[in-house]
Amino acid sequence: MASALSPGSRVLIALIRVYQRLISPLLGPHCRFTPTCSSYGIEALRRFGVIKGSWLTVKRVLKCHPLHPGGDDPVPPGPFDTREH
């Protein structure tokens, strides 16, 4: 995980946080995945940066629908991530 986030990543993370605090409580819990799509997006942006993190987040949100079973779907390890998954 990079120690310094790009300005683009910071903006997107801030937008996700606004969604988490203002919109998500009104909609109620309905994400099919663990972690939630918004948490996944924040982690993907932190781990991969704005371009790849955004792409992973969009792919994840597009999978979050009633025809997909959902389940555990963690963010893939980053290029410098030494943790075992």
UniProtKB/Swiss-Prot annotation:
Topology of the protein relative to the lipid bilayer: Peripheral membrane protein
MF GO annotations: toxin activity
Task of the protein: Could be involved in insertion of integral membrane proteins into the membrane. Lyses fish blood cells.
Principal location listed in the UniProt entry: membrane
Gene from which this protein is expressed: hlyA
InterPro entries: Membr_insert_effic_factor_YidD (IPR002696)
Keywords for the protein's UniProt record, in alphabetical order: Cell membrane, Cytolysis, Hemolysis, Membrane, Toxin, Virulence
This protein's record includes keyword Cell membrane: yes
Domain of life: Bacteria
Assigned protein family: Belongs to the UPF0161 family.
GO biological process: killing of cells of another organism
Protein name: Putative membrane protein insertion efficiency factor
Subcellular location: Cell membrane
GO cellular component, one term: plasma membrane
